[in-house]
């Protein structure tokens, strides 16, 4: 009788690893065989320079299986205490409609998509973002809006920068209302320091004492007061300065829009439009301006254009403003945004419609009026005369007793100095909330009845002169999907227009579109993580603290750094935060004159944009013919900079997709001249477990948790870009004015609105590392294997532009299409669009080298999917040969006409190739056809005829 396997033999500690990796062991071996290799070890020996290799297992706890990891994280979550938080300050309770929760936030068709650079396969989320822009335009009363920024505080900093760019005033002074949210003031102070702006934080009544280029005003202000801003705005305009207004989006349903008051820029958070507080984020900021500032506005703008058949099509407009084009001359270093959260907010508006939204706002205001009336009758002094949802109270010596009573009732109030308290009501509040507040503030024997107060004619807290009279959201999209059936189908219709990871590989170079495992995603909607206000007392967030501290320890083990700053909520913000730490470090050593930042010519566009934001001068270091940093040019420029050298920004592996042999020497050159090394973490997926940035010589590096550590891209955000630093830089990273962080110097300003950035998505990365453990190195190795497998099989058709040692690439490779374009006129864009007909998202176009495609397959794609991509690319190469041989006209062939749509086959087909060749060019497309929603979009038309609001329905006819 055969012996049954024992429990120890049946234990499967690497079950998740096998789920995460695309190719199984046999497929990996087949791929290695095709490369002439016997093992992954041999591949790594041939690829990664021996001098930087880790050569030991990562110091991480053993991998947990999915259920064990979820159980452990649940244990952390249960240590968070979810109280009724009425702290306000830009964060409010909200109710996410379940149809949106299930079909958007929990749907990989929405959260695994990439930024819509390829509009033909992104029309669904482009429409959702256009709705978001329309929502912003209507509520703010301005003409132009972008498709979201990272948070309200960074939006304020962007508003200040825009004001300086466009204001005719010659002043270098920017005014900030002292009654803005404190986190906003801190982020603006941080940004002003980098730009060299003078900043005045004062009462708005003193604005007229100053000559400024702009001012930041809050409406309603942080204490709830609603002020008529017209006199202040008129004064600013008289001195050719800009008025930038931070507004509460829900209040604008009842308040006169700031644009009607004369504001030039309006921004705020869309968080209370259905996005949980999440201990600080992620949330989509709204940002609107006058149309005349369209070339200066930061972030993505979704515009209306036409496709090749003349039909309405959407696209990202005016991209020449952005960092990937303009580099150090860009308006901003903004790279990602908060698309997934902007979509949720826009769908919240679509689902509720104008009347539903108004009802929510009116209900919040009515509850606040009832509360205010009851308190007033009991002699509680209210410090803000007018209000929407926020009351600031002077309770004098009763403050301590009231705080204790609130704690007993599990209610968080805003605790202010001088015997004052603040409270903000929200959508999640009801009559019971107000009754509990009466008990807390007045004692149980107050004798007030909510019903009796509600039956009275209570005065509005909004002054009559500031009550909204203009209509909003009249477009049909906001008035047609109010039943759940209609909303469900609308969401599905939009989703079907887009291509995401749930349909096929997205081989975008430098983007790391790997698996976002379901087990990693589940915890983000747990109430214990989703419903915490970022400014609750730390004892209510013990679970978050334990999870974040453990994640920081793991990231230190992975990177070799001594400390982690979790605050940056994007990779570009991480760059900025790291460079600020370097700047403060030099200043602490009386070397504040070090302001030259060396950047290789191949760098991401965010690098020079971030450097100029941190107050540095950018000097470009050339690359040699092999794509590596020119060491002699680096030495010469470092020597020339001398005592002015601040740092080098370098990406590793390089943006050219190779492990540079001289990286350690490059770091030594910088250190020899007194500089610091900033390592861009965009390509960390090729380092984890194989090498560590700090060991290589980096002093600081950001980690894209939305690339390497599995936070999904969300169609263009959210992201997280925490930085790792060596010990000497640790005191100089960001702190926070509301929730001080242990470690950094107390005087350090914030770079994001919340202390730990977008904290509610950190469980995703925690889960990934917990389930992979030391075997994270396997992911890096398989990613490198997949890239070399593609390079090997495609190099005969499309030359691989750069290779490293032994002709190997790192985790991505650049295919050079320039010779083919010169010979045939077929461009990299034509190939990108043709790939859509094969059911693929294109690789990264023309970065870092124009006329090329950069391909990154990641470790998560199966051999079958890699082979399908290879087959598609080789088939496209054969199509190019047909053009080259004259069998198809140069301008009328499947590549120039790509992508093909349903409209093409329902119309008259008069083309030199068959419908089958155009529509279903391979076996996969015959069985699993993905239809692009529109034909090729006309980029030039869209920029020349900028239109960034919802399209009239008749335009689709």
Swiss-Prot record:
The answer, when asked if Oxidoreductase is one of the entry's keywords, is: yes
According to UniProt, the reaction catalysed is: N(6)-[(R)-lipoyl]-L-lysyl-[glycine-cleavage complex H protein] + glycine + H(+) = N(6)-[(R)-S(8)-aminomethyldihydrolipoyl]-L-lysyl-[glycine-cleavage complex H protein] + CO2
Q: Name one GO biological process term.
A: glycine decarboxylation via glycine cleavage system
InterPro entries assigned to the protein according to its UniProt record, in alphabetical order: GcvP, GDC-P_C, GDC-P_N, GDC_P, PyrdxlP-dep_Trfase, PyrdxlP-dep_Trfase_major, PyrdxlP-dep_Trfase_small
Q: Which EC numbers characterise this protein's activity in its record?
A: 1.4.4.2
Alphabetically list the UniProt keywords. Oxidoreductase, Pyridoxal phosphate
The cofactor named in the record is: pyridoxal 5'-phosphate
**Listed Pfam families:** GcvP2_C, GDC-P
What molecular function does GO assign, one term? glycine dehydrogenase (decarboxylating) activity
Q: Which residues carry this modification: N6-(pyridoxal phosphate)lysine?
A: 707
Its Gene Ontology cellular component terms are:
cytosol; glycine cleavage complex
What EC class does the entry list? oxidoreductase
Q: What does the similarity note say?
A: Belongs to the GcvP family.
Q: What do we know about how this protein assembles, alone or with others?
A: The glycine cleavage system is composed of four proteins: P, T, L and H.
Q: What does this protein do?
A: The glycine cleavage system catalyzes the degradation of glycine. The P protein binds the alpha-amino group of glycine through its pyridoxal phosphate cofactor; CO(2) is released and the remaining methylamine moiety is then transferred to the lipoamide cofactor of the H protein.
Instruction: Give the PANTHER family listed for this entry.
Output: GLYCINE DEHYDROGENASE (DECARBOXYLATING), GLYCINE DEHYDROGENASE, DECARBOXYLATING
Official protein name in the record: Glycine dehydrogenase (decarboxylating) 2
Look up and give the organism this protein is from. Pseudomonas fluorescens (strain Pf0-1)
């Amino acid at each position: 009788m055969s012996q049954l396997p024992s429990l120890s033999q049946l234990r499967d500690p690497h079950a998740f690893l096998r789920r995460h990796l695309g190719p199984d062991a046999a497929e990996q071996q087949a791929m290695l065989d095709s490369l002439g290799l016997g093992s992954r070890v041999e591949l790594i020996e041939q690829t990664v320079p021996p001098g930087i290799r880790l050569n030991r297992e990562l110091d991480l706890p053993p991998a947990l299986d999915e259920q064990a990891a979820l159980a452990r994280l649940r244990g952390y979550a249960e240590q968070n205490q979810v109280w009724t938080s009425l702290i306000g300050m830009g964060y409010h309770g909200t109710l996410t409609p379940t149809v949106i929760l299930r079909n958007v936030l929990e749907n990989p068709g929405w959260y695994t998509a990439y930024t819509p650079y390829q509009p033909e396969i992104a029309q669904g989320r482009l429409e959702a973002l256009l709705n978001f822009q329309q929502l912003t335009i209507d509520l703010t009363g301005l003409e132009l809006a972008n498709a979201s920024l990272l948070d309200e505080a960074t939006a304020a900093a962007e508003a200040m920068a825009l004001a300086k760019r466009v204001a005719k005033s010659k002043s270098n002074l920017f005014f900030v209302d002292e009654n803005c949210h404190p986190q906003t003031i801190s982020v603006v102070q941080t940004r002003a320091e980098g730009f060299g702006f003078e900043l005045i934080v004062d009462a708005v009544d003193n604005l007229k004492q100053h000559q400024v280029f702009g001012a930041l005003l809050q409406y309603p202000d942080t204490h709830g007061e609603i002020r008529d801003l017209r006199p202040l705005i008129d004064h600013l305009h008289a001195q050719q300065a800009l008025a930038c207004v931070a507004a509460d989006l829900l209040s604008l349903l009842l308040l006169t829009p700031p644009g009607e008051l004369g504001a030039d820029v309006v921004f705020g958070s869309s968080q209370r439009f259905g996005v949980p507080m999440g201990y600080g984020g992620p949330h989509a900021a709204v940002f609107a301006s006058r149309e005349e500032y369209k070339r200066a506005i930061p972030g993505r703008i979704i515009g209306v254009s036409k496709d090749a058949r003349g039909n309405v099509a959407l696209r990202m407009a005016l991209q020449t403003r952005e960092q990937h084009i303009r580099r150090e001359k860009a308006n901003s270093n903004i790279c990602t945004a908060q698309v997934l959260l902007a979509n949720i907010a826009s769908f919240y508006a679509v689902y509720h419609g104008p009347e539903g939204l108004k009802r929510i706002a009116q209900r919040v205001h009515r509850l606040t009026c009832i509360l205010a009336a009851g308190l007033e009758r009991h002699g509680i002094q209210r410090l803000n005369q007018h209000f929407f949802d926020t009351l600031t109270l002077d309770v004098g010596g009763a403050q301590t007793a009231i705080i204790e009573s609130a704690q007993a009732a599990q209610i968080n109030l805003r605790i202010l100095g001088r015997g004052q308290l603040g409270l903000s009501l929200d959508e999640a509040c009801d009559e019971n909330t107000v009754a509990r507040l009466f008990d807390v503030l007045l004692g149980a024997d107050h004798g007030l009845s909510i019903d009796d107060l509600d039956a009275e004619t209570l005065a509005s807290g909004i002054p009559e002169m500031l009550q909204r009279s203009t209509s909003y959201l009249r477009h049909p999209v906001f008035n047609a999907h109010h039943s759940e059936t209609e909303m469900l189908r609308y969401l599905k219709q939009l989703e079907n227009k887009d291509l995401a990871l749930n349909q096929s590989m997205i081989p975008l170079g430098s983007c790391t579109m790997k698996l976002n495992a379901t087990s990693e995603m589940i915890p983000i909607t747990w109430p214990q993580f989703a419903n915490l206000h970022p400014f609750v007392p730390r004892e209510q967030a013990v679970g978050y603290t334990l999870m974040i501290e453990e994640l920081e320890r793991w990231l230190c083990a992975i990177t070799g750094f001594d400390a982690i700053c979790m605050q940056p909520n994007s990779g570009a913000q991480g760059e900025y935060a790291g460079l600020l730490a370097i700047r403060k470090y030099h200043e602490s050593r009386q070397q504040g004159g070090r302001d030259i930042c060396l950047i290789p010519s191949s760098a991401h566009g965010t690098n020079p944009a971030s450097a100029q934001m941190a107050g540095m001068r950018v000097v470009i270091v050339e690359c040699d013919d092999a794509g590596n940093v020119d060491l002699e040019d680096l030495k010469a420029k470092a020597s020339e900079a001398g005592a002015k050298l601040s740092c080098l920004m370098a990406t590793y592996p390089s943006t050219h997709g190779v492990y540079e042999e001289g990286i350690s020497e490059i770091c030594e050159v910088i250190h020899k001249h007194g500089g610091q090394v900033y390592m861009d973490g965009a390509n960390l997926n090729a380092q984890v477990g194989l090498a560590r940035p700090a060991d290589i010589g980096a002093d600081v590096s950001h980690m894209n948790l939305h690339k390497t550590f599995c936070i999904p891209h969300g169609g263009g955000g959210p992201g997280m870009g925490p930085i790792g630093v060596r010990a000497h830089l640790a005191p100089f990273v960001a702190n926070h004015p509301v929730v001080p962080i242990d470690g950094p110097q107390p005087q350090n300003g914030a770079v994001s609105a919340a202390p730990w950035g977008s904290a509610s998505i950190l469980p995703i990365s925690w889960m990934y590392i917990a389930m992979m453990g030391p075997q994270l190195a396997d992911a890096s190795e398989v990613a490198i294997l997949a890239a070399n497998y593609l390079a090997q099989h495609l190099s005969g058709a499309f030359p691989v532009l750069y290779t490293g040692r032994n002709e190997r690439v790192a985790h991505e490779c650049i295919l050079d299409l320039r010779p083919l374009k010169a010979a045939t006129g077929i461009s990299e864009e034509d190939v990108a669009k043709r790939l859509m007909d094969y059911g693929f998202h294109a690789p990264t176009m023309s970065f870092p080298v124009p006329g090329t495609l950069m391909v990154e397959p990641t470790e998560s794609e199966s051999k079958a999917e890699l082979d399908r991509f290879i087959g598609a690319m080789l088939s496209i190469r054969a199509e190019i040969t047909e053009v080259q041989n004259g069998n198809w006209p140069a301008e009328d062939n499947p590549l120039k006409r790509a992508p093909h749509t349903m409209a093409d086959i329902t119309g008259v087909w008069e083309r030199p190739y068959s419908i089958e060749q155009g529509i279903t060019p391979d076996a996969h497309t015959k069985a699993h056809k993905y239809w692009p929603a529109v034909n090729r979009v006309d980029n030039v038309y869209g920029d020349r005829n900028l239109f960034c609001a919802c399209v009239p329905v008749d335009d689709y006819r």
